């Protein structure tokens, strides 16, 4: 093919065609049949800073994420009110999320944390303070209230978090002992119990804080994650995030300087030396202690309903795997109980700290409620081919498959596969594995807790009122437009 172009110009060809992602509204039919589901009161109790394996006490911190994996019943095995609703030979049923309310109990309380040996050498904001000479161990006890975060995110798959961690160096560029390692931005699914960012950054603190003194106790040897909103927004399907709501606030309460050998010196062209060098041992590695400030009910994201009319991705709330992932981050109720117990059974008559044992506990209280709509998917050749491309596991659950190419190799099938007379048969391939079996979630089973009587539940009544329907048992029906066939005599005046 001959192509003419001006001298020195580049010739650009169009990119290769890609598979277009379709909106679920183009092949998922809404039925206007709604169900309500809710949980019991969900409670969790544990130590706010670390877990105690000897007594099987978990770590339950107000600065942790709570990720609920909500299991829904299979609508294709559901007892439907109308048998003519769909044809099982040509259609399959799915759930779509329409409403959600995450309710939280317990009073508001600022989250307080700290470290009994925090890496703070000296006060860096008070210019008149007398500086002490650096020693081998300048750590001090420090407590603080941390960055305040409220976050609610719902999707069909786990939310994606981001954090900074050590990177693999290039070949031949291995850092020497004591050098700063290369770092990179990493991603991982947000699991139940992962730590939020509380004002120190989203980092892998097991690698970044090897002196165990740079961050509060509940961050030691753990990762603090921040939801990767950019990556989830770029996902065309949007399965990991149908929608989210968040509220963050933080300010710096105090500024300190860190202790340690500073190997990255200030360039000489950035400062002038003092005539009397009295600050040769000062540290320029500054850090600020965060504070979330006032906690009030004015800015609460919880205990209120959310309605999903249009998701941020092309999956408009369809739960293909009959499950939902609700990710919650809320440290506005991060109060810690202090429990004092005498060392013996006698009632103390005067205060003596040596005769009292002190314990810490943190408690959390949740309740979830959802509004689901029943939807149908017609099993056309185009729809099956598209689902085979974007979500083949759905067709496997529906027992709908694309015919594989004819086998060219004769395979062997043994009878009595558990017999010792034959070779070992691999049984793991036949068993269906959970794709999230290595992740930790708070499993919630709603497979037997759905109800069509929406007016019997608070969220259901709000949904009915949102659509202009009263809570009366009698449903309003549209007026009949059929003309009357009764012949009436016409009155004539004489």
From Swiss-Prot:
GO terms classed as biological process: endocytosis involved in viral entry into host cell; virion attachment to host cell
Composition skew (Basic residues), residue ranges = 485-494
The primary location reported for this protein is virion
Q: Name one GO cellular component term.
A: T=7 icosahedral viral capsid
Q: Where is this region: Disordered?
A: 475-494
Sorted alphabetically, the keyword list is: Capsid protein, Disulfide bond, Host nucleus, Host-virus interaction, Late protein, T=7 icosahedral capsid protein, Viral attachment to host cell, Viral penetration into host cytoplasm, Virion, Virus endocytosis by host, Virus entry into host cell
MF GO annotations: structural molecule activity
Which compartment or compartments is the protein found in?
A: Virion; Host nucleus
State the Gene3D superfamilies in the record. Answer: Major capsid L1 (late) superfamily, Papillomavirus (2.60.175.20)
Belongs to which family? Belongs to the papillomaviridae L1 protein family.
Q: State how it assembles.
A: Self-assembles into homopentamers. The capsid has an icosahedral symmetry and consists of 72 capsomers, with each capsomer being a pentamer of L1. Interacts with the minor capsid protein L2; this interaction is necessary for viral genome encapsidation. Interacts with protein E2; this interaction enhances E2-dependent replication and transcription activation.
Q: What is the annotated role of this protein in its UniProt record?
A: Forms an icosahedral capsid with a T=7 symmetry and a 50 nm diameter. The capsid is composed of 72 pentamers linked to each other by disulfide bonds and associated with L2 proteins. Binds to heparan sulfate proteoglycans on cell surface of basal layer keratinocytes to provide initial virion attachment. This binding mediates a conformational change in the virus capsid that facilitates efficient infection. The virion enters the host cell via endocytosis. During virus trafficking, L1 protein dissociates from the viral DNA and the genomic DNA is released to the host nucleus.
What name is this protein filed under?
A: Major capsid protein L1
Q: Which gene encodes it?
A: L1
